[in-house]
Amino acid sequence: MGGIMAPKDIMTNTHAKSILNSMNSLRKSNTLCDVTLRVEQKDFPAHRIVLAACSDYFCAMFTSELSEKGKPYVDIQGLTASTMEILLDFVYTETVHVTVENVQELLPAACLLQLKGVKQACCEFLESQLDPSNCLGIRDFAETHNCVDLMQAAEVFSQKHFPEVVQHEEFILLSQGEVEKLIKCDEIQVDSEEPVFEAVINWVKHAKKEREESLPDLLQYVRMPLLTPRYITDVIDAEPFIRCSLQCRDLVDEAKKFHLRPELRSQMQGPRTRARLGDNEVLLVVGGFGSQQSPIDVVEKYDPKTQEWSFLPSITRKRRYVASVSLHDRIYVIGGYDGRSRLSSVECLDYTADEDGVWYSVAPMNVRRGLAGATTLGDMIYVSGGFDGSRRHTSMERYDPNIDQWSMLGDMQTAREGAGLVVASGIIYCLGGYDGLNILNSVEKYDPHTGHWTNVTPMATKRSGAGVALLNDHIYVVGGFDGTAHLSSVEAYNIRTDSWTTVTSMTTPRCYVGATVLRGRLYAIAGYDGNSLLSSIECYDPIIDSWEVVASMGTQRCDAGVCVLREK
């Protein structure tokens, strides 16, 4: 061959694997093996050099002056023969078979023999199995075996799913110290302190004799001043454990004082009056009618922790009069009006993907709908009413994302566009709207078990284009248009008493406004004040019955879709 050829190092991808396969064949045929591991009276021939290369435990055993250094047989204590077989297979093949049945033996054995690859595989498997019923046990198991990443993952999971976790036996069986550690944590994700209080009471009731004296110590970590006055008087005051304890009564009195003496709140600041930080909810605003007097495709995200707005990928079609919901880490944008016609199409964004992900289409509704109401119940999306360009609808349909299919349900009693749709205690409520002739104050509710709509007490004010959201046990209706004026007024419906009360008005009139709840507060988003499109956002605190303006969006709009999503 002519010319000068430079030398080159060439690495093959199969060499190491080929050697491992050959050594495994030698092991299985007991060829060139120079040590036998004995576990539970069962012998496992092996090669010292292979064991030492994979395990610091065996490396120390065979290279130091330990008694096992030159012995042909080594007894291994603290693990079973079946586990030893799995570990040896890993040493010679790089593959480990982890199951629910073997992981509790495999992980401690991997720690004992210092097989880092097996330990990591077990931790990854357990993390994939995290569930509200087992996360506390996995956290303790991880802590016992110094699996720091797994322990942190289990801890975060228990915080994120606190209301579900406390329903399971693992929580009830915790020690007082473990309960304290969990409920004092700022990061637990709850919509209010109600599930925290109820978790403490249920834990005490499980073993009343032994645990009753622990109640005052635990109750100091429940942020009772952040509970509603009604819950304090109706639920906490009625709890026998509370009435029987002077220390508990003092904590309840502190909460009442916080509500009754607002002028003293600045002096009462402390851990019990501080909102928890763990709720990673963000607010999403999609589409709407923009400042160019046309539908828009802009999507913005608000983080209440930083009070900052950022942009997400635009929807594929410009839409006003649009509805939006979130379900299982996905954002759905439903119906609307593109400037030419009312739409039945639905777009979806998988929020578990990167923020440069793309919107994709799912099955369209059976009916074209603009200004429809949308909500979620269980694993389903419900959409009712709306305007198709020629008539207002009484119909409601339901979307099942598992089969990507819409189905028609029972009709409302009144045709409505611009109505609000919300779920409370498993019942769907439709509020206000416009029937083609009149602005409505009527409210009807749908029972999914019977498939029927019935009327409930109407609102005090006729409203179309109002924002609707559930906070604690009240449905709040904000702003809208009454046929004459754009409204700033707000009223709240008590689902227990079927009655309405008026609360403090917003600082700005808002029609075609979005409403949702974030971290225990009600948000009113953008809208139209009768003169201008708005980018401003207001936040209502039900504890002090007061609104405050928070950071404005980058886009002025009304008729937008609004939803809340929990970030990972």
Curated annotation (Swiss-Prot):
Pathway: Protein modification; protein ubiquitination. GO terms for biological process: COPII vesicle coating; endoplasmic reticulum to Golgi vesicle-mediated transport; neural crest cell development; neural crest formation; proteasome-mediated ubiquitin-dependent protein catabolic process; protein monoubiquitination; Wnt signaling pathway. The keyword Repressor does not apply. The keyword Transport applies. Residues 135-236 form the BACK domain. Residues 405-568 are annotated as: Interaction with DVL3. GO terms for cellular component: COPII vesicle coat; COPII-coated ER to Golgi transport vesicle; Cul3-RING ubiquitin ligase complex; cytoplasm. Kelch repeats lie at residues 282-329, 331-379, 380-426, 427-473, 475-520, 522-567. Keywords: Cytoplasmic vesicle, ER-Golgi transport, Kelch repeat, Repeat, Transport, Ubl conjugation, Ubl conjugation pathway, Wnt signaling pathway. InterPro entries: BACK (IPR011705), BTB-kelch_protein (IPR017096), BTB/POZ_dom (IPR000210), Kelch-typ_b-propeller (IPR015915), Kelch_1 (IPR006652), SKP1/BTB/POZ_sf (IPR011333). One of its GO terms (molecular function) is ubiquitin-like ligase-substrate adaptor activity. SMART domains: BACK, BTB, Kelch. Ubiquitinated by the SCF(FBXL17) complex, leading to its degradation by the proteasome: ubiquitination by the SCF(FBXL17) complex takes place when aberrant BTB domain dimers are formed. It is found in: Cytoplasmic vesicle, COPII-coated vesicle. It comes from the Eukaryota. Residues 33-100 form the BTB domain. Substrate-specific adapter of a BCR (BTB-CUL3-RBX1) E3 ubiquitin ligase complex that acts as a negative regulator of Wnt signaling pathway and ER-Golgi transport. The BCR(KLHL12) complex is involved in ER-Golgi transport by regulating the size of COPII coats, thereby playing a key role in collagen export, which is required for embryonic stem (ES) cells division: BCR(KLHL12) acts by mediating monoubiquitination of SEC31 (SEC31A or SEC31B). The BTB domain is required for interaction with CUL3. PANTHER family: KELCH PROTEIN, KELCH-LIKE PROTEIN 12. Component of the BCR(KLHL12) E3 ubiquitin ligase complex, at least composed of CUL3 and KLHL12 and RBX1. This complex interacts with DVL3 upon activation of the Wnt signaling pathway by WNT3A. Interacts with DRD4, KLHL2 and SEC31A. Interacts with PEF1 and PDCD6/ALG-2; interaction takes place in response to cytosolic calcium increase and leads to bridge together the BCR(KLHL12) complex and SEC31 (SEC31A or SEC31B). This is Kelch-like protein 12. The lineage of its organism: Eukaryota, Metazoa, Chordata, Craniata, Vertebrata.
